[in-house]
Amino acid sequence: MATPTRAIVYWEGDSRDVLKTWPRDVQRDFGLSLRKLQDGERPTLDARPMQSVGQGVFELKAEDEAAWYRVIYLRIEDTIYVLDSFTKKTRKTEKNDLNRARARLSNLKLRLQKEKIDAKRKSDK
């Protein structure tokens, strides 16, 4: 039986840099959840759909005494795209965080569409 391939993780914008500023244990928790997602398993952290950002977009959630930590991601086939990472201090997600994730999703879709067109042109030659 073939071993399933692990999904690749792509970090959009500064999402990885932001996560790297978080406390080590929080980074580890998100790393473990992303690894589970890569392997096609359920994440260890709480996750919920983020329809307000886009179809198929999810939010991983963790917290400590200092803040609430969020990673917004989308899985397309064998790739996980981390659209945004941010912290928040209130229950409400800030509009600028949602808008940034939406903009990155829009840019991602355009980029993937362009890559598909370029690949088709290349194969037609």
Spans of features found by a protein language model:
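Basic, Lys/Arg-enriched alpha-helical interface segments
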Residues: 1-68, 76-80, 87-125
